[in-house]
């Protein structure tokens, strides 16, 4: 009986639409306001049927409709503050572009460009010409090609060089590359026949040698950029595989995945070969990503032997997988920075974050601690602690990056509730929880985000206190 009375007390749609809060919105977009009004009323009818004992008044209902209207008008793709310490966070978009790359992409987006027009000859040009020269210069390869991501680069290479024939690969390199996409599945889609050799932890060059036959089209090496097998292991070296390929007349291809263009060993980052090193060892085709360790836009980069890359450029898949003008412009600007490695490390945000020294990170953390202590006041205790960052993005899996984190201990509520509340602030903040402390790793905080972070924490702490840890 009570639920029927409550249902009757809900205002009619037409009545609610006359509320002053909704009149202006209705003039702006009547269909959306009407749909949201019906949605809100339906939601409350369901709540009443499920046991709700009170209902909001018309003003509160109108406010709920208004809030949903404004939320629906916001972009779904939003900036977030990354305080996780994961530099190449796949779920947060991986690499942050340099100022030069952002400017180049913006120009390409807002102006006509000579994307496929040869200004000297006055005729159709080649879109890849804007980056192929740079890639050849930086890697030492004979030829280069760019598609829209590295999985596409692998698919194109296998489809061109090995469709209908055999590709030999070590069992220990049959990796999953993220999003449930696995190397064997990509290989199967290309039309090549997978020939597995060796075991998960040990593969020798004679395993490859015994598998080579008249139908062998390719010797494939996949660099394990997102994992490491340690202990009782044996892996075929690049030099061994290249020597075998030369001896039997079969091309060698390597999927580097991440793809460094400069050696960062001086900064303590090891275990990731550079593209140049693999080309210099004689690998015929190398593929790698643009938006991982390179620090550029999403792209799949192919470098290697002139005849093999030229064959890929002429494959029908190339058009389906081609890179767009904005990413191409950003990639060109990113590659230009690599002509001066010292400049690249400073200007490309991914590299700058990876090589940041612990002592510099501590200074940044101390400055941020002062700001947050002042702003948060009695809402939380703010501290500092050493922590460890990660490269992320399926890169440098065993490399630990010493860092510093701000710690937040709320005076009311716990860190679990706070980390949830931070995801709902504007902008959202992504952080970690450890021992009931909220950790904000300064390695992945961008310049100028301190004030935004402080405001978000105030908003989240008040929300966490009032809303609990739900």
Curated annotation (Swiss-Prot):
Its cofactor is pyridoxal 5'-phosphate. It is an enzyme of class 2 (transferase). Its EC number is 2.9.1.1. Pathway: Aminoacyl-tRNA biosynthesis; selenocysteinyl-tRNA(Sec) biosynthesis; selenocysteinyl-tRNA(Sec) from L-seryl-tRNA(Sec) (bacterial route): step 1/1. Belongs to the SelA family. Converts seryl-tRNA(Sec) to selenocysteinyl-tRNA(Sec) required for selenoprotein biosynthesis. PANTHER family: L-SERYL-TRNA(SEC) SELENIUM TRANSFERASE. This is L-seryl-tRNA(Sec) selenium transferase. It comes from Moorella thermoacetica (Clostridium thermoaceticum). The lineage of its organism: Bacteria, Bacillati, Bacillota, Clostridia, Moorellales.
């Amino acid at each position: 009986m009570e639920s029927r009375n409550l249902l009757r007390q809900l205002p009619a749609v037409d009545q609610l639409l006359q509320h002053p809060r909704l009149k202006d919105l209705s003039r702006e977009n009547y269909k959306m306001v009407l749909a949201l009004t019906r949605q809100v009323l339906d939601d409350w009818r369901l709540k009443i049927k499920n046991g709700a004992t009170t209902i909001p008044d018309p003003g509160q209902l109108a406010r709920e409709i208004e809030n949903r209207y404004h939320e629906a008008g916001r972009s779904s793709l939003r900036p977030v503050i990354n305080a996780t310490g994961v530099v190449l966070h796949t779920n947060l978009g991986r690499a942050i572009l340099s100022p030069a790359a952002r400017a180049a992409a913006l120009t390409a987006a807002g102006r006509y460009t000579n994307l496929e027009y040869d200004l000297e000859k006055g005729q159709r040009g080649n879109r890849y010409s804007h980056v192929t020269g740079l890639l050849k210069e930086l890697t030492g390869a004979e030829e280069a090609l760019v598609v829209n991501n590295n999985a596409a680069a692998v698919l194109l290479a296998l489809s061109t060089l090995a469709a209908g024939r055999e590709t030999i690969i070590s069992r220990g390199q049959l990796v999953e590359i993220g999003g449930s996409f696995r190397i064997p599945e990509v290989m199967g889609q290309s039309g090549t026949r997978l020939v597995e050799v060796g075991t998960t932890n040990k593969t020798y060059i004679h395993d490859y040698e015994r598998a080579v036959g008249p139908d062998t089209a390719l010797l494939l090496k996949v660099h394990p950029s997102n994992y490491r097998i340690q202990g009782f292991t044996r892996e075929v070296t690049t030099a061994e595989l290249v020597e075998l390929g030369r001896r039997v007349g079969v091309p060698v291809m390597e999927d580097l995945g991440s793809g460094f263009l400069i050696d960062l060993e001086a900064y303590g980052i090891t275990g990731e070969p550079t593209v140049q090193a693999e080309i210099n060892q004689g690998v015929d085709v190398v593929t790698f990503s643009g938006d991982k360790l390179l620090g550029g836009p999403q792209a799949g980069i192919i470098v290697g032997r002139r005849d093999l890359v030229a064959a890929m450029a002429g494959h029908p898949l190339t058009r389906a997988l081609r890179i767009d003008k904005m990413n191409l412009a950003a990639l060109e600007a990113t590659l230009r920075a690599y002509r001066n490695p010292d400049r690249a490390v400073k200007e490309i945000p991914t590299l700058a974050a990876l090589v940041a020294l612990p002592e510099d990170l501590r200074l940044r953390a101390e400055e941020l601690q002062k700001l947050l202590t002042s702003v948060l006041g009695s809402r939380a205790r703010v501290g500092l602690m050493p922590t460890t960052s990660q490269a992320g993005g399926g890169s440098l899996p065993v490399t630990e990056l010493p860092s510093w984190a701000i710690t937040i201990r709320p005076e009311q509520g716990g860190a679990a509730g706070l980390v949830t509340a931070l995801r709902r602030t504007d902008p959202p903040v992504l952080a970690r929880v450890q021992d009931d402390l909220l950790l904000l790793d300064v390695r992945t905080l961008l310049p100028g985000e301190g004030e935004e972070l402080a405001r978000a924490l105030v908003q989240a702490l008040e929300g966490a206190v009032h809303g609990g840890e739900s």
